[in-house]
From Swiss-Prot:
Belongs to the bacterial ribosomal protein bL34 family. One of its GO terms (molecular function) is structural constituent of ribosome. GO terms for biological process: translation. This is Large ribosomal subunit protein bL34.
């Protein structure tokens, strides 16, 4: 069985990156929650 995690920086950024989060209303809510919680890293 192949491993499910096949890393790709490009896919990671496109799906979970800061600009991807900012692009949608819900994504901005994610960032707001993470800021409120005090996360050191907001996004990938």
């Amino acid at each position: 069985m192949k491993r499910t995690f096949q890393p790709s920086v490009l896919k990671r950024k496109r799906v979970h990156g800061f600009r991807a989060r900012m692009a949608t209303k819900n994504g901005r809510q994610v960032l707001a929650r993470r800021r409120a919680k005090g996360r050191k890293r907001l996004s990938a």
